[in-house]
């Protein structure tokens, strides 16, 4: 049997990514040459491996160049498309943005209170005009950043011996797949918000981001932007105020405010506020201590009301546990009775009463589990004083001038001024932690002012008031905040105390200024130039400031010293020309009865006369006919019975509450006086200046002037008429404290008769007016002074007069 041929061992399989060449093609003899041959073989293998690696490197570089070219071409195409669609897209984007965020938007009720948009990164301008547009712009900038720097494809393994061909091709396939996913995920949508509604694109972007290396810096930036976004949203929600009659806000706690969770005081340092490009506050500090009553004073138009609104809207960082209320709008006119409008302001009480009714219904149906919760509800109602709520609301309304019938009258039956009183009553009824009142006496008569003055003297929570009524500030306030030179300055005590301290401070500043000017003059006389003298003086001030800082360890005054400026004295002086003597009586009503058609008479059988030296203040609640009495004295109304008698040479100067109706709005103040009294140009301007109207306002149309400026034009007109009798109906409205003082001094110096209706207690007391009370269709003179009248008013309301020592 022939032997089978000897089988050769199987050829080893060659693993590689090139051509498979078997080493068995060459017969190798055993012996010393074998080692030499094997060494030559591995040397050849190393050479081949090196060549293959270089080829792969070249291919990889070409592939990367192609990818970069594709990205650049795509970017150019998108840029060209974006330029063509920019106008259309921008309008569509902002329109869609406002629709999506409509519930969070703030109505532009006041131009001064616009919330400034956050500054975009890198100094780029935002496309939108609000905070949301700025945030969307930041998001689009991040997407463009990712397009400029796409994720790098996975690198292929260099070890060709340990990799199979299928495994080597896999990275390339993955890179291709990743490129396709990126091209899908990063394709620009038709607008910025399409990506928010496309879940598939969001998932693809998340897959790509998982493959990218972590970017902690970018994540932190996004987190910070999100926190800022939430803060802005909370601020805008608060500013919206749901079109309510007053602003009540409670902001979300930020990380910084969390440290102040239980804070009862407000401490804000170095804040700035600007409006219409005008800086109102620069590096100002706000300090409000709990349970103190502050009066905020300063010239008109400098930002007092703006500050109150920023606090109410929490544009400034107010501790979150302090609830803030700014009473600034009248209640809605509807079928709700006035007393119910006040009671409904306490939403917590309403919820407890509703829960009480629900739990009682459950008990009646045999549900005994509600008993425990009902007991807790009763305890909460007792703690909030719910049983006495209606009595408290009616007491407040009565003090503000509402009789029992008016308290049950629907709010739509009241005028705007009376609805404003209802709004004030709601604010007093709610008792917030910080109550802010902006000119609360403007819509009140004297009796209501007396009651409010007395009521707020017993206020136990924090109070911040803006008012031009010096008597009101003297009685109510424990501290004064003075807005001056874009800063807030604090004085302990009432307004009278502040006035004395401020005058002393101004005298000291004037002395320092004069000393500085003397030093500068000496340096100039010694050969120094003006610039050198000022520099040397500043250096001396710097040394003095550093010395004081070391002595007092004062870290607040870090600003570079500036040369002192002459202290500005805000002085207003009203003057009325003295009339010639007239024989008495110069004016009077004799047997006068008057009533409007279809109504019961306001007056019956009035009989009195007025002399040239009379000083009369007519007082009484709203609606009794005080303004009507003035119209009868001026001859603008004719009595139903009886007659008005006056001296044939008598000239009457009448200041009406609706003084704007007598002005010609298209004229300037100068033109108005020139036309009415044939005055030279300079004389007309001098007359306006005497009543505190700024020189730049002399040549502005009257329709563009503020209420206070228009009032000064009317006072100037009265002076030009040279009246024998001044009849003034609420002349202090829209005047600041300095102007009211000037008016009081002018009345005291005036030689003619004065009849005034006013709710300003200080004007009444400073002019020593006799008090004539209008009540029950008659006019009678009070025996006693103003303090006696206050006591009578409060006793009639069942109140006890608070006697607080002046600080």
UniProtKB/Swiss-Prot annotation:
Chain residues that bind ATP 1: 298-305
Superkingdom, natural source: Eukaryota
Residues that bind ATP 2: 620-627
InterPro entries: AAA+_ATPase (IPR003593), ABC_transporter-like_ATP-bd (IPR003439), ABC_transporter-like_CS (IPR017871), ABCF_EF3_subfamily (IPR050611), P-loop_NTPase (IPR027417)
Comp. bias regions, Basic and acidic residues: 47-64, 147-160, 206-221, 521-542
Modified residues (Phosphoserine): 22, 24, 105, 109, 140, 166, 557
Localisation: Cytoplasm; Nucleus, Nucleoplasm; Nucleus envelope
PTM (free text): Phosphorylated at phosphoserine and phosphothreonine. Phosphorylation on Ser-109 and Ser-140 by CK2; inhibits association of EIF2 with ribosomes.
GO CC annotation, single: nuclear envelope
CDD domains hit by this protein: ABCF_EF-3 (cd03221)
Record's subunit section: Interacts (via N-terminus) with EIF2S1; the interaction is independent of its phosphorylated status. Associates (via both ABC transporter domains) with the ribosomes.
Function of the molecule: Required for efficient Cap- and IRES-mediated mRNA translation initiation. Not involved in the ribosome biogenesis.
Family annotation (NCBIfam families): ribo_prot_ABC_F
Family: Belongs to the ABC transporter superfamily. ABCF family. EF3 subfamily.
The protein, known as: ATP-binding cassette sub-family F member 1
Species per Swiss-Prot/TrEMBL record: Pan troglodytes (Chimpanzee)
Source taxonomy: Eukaryota, Metazoa, Chordata, Craniata, Vertebrata
Gene name linked to the record: ABCF1
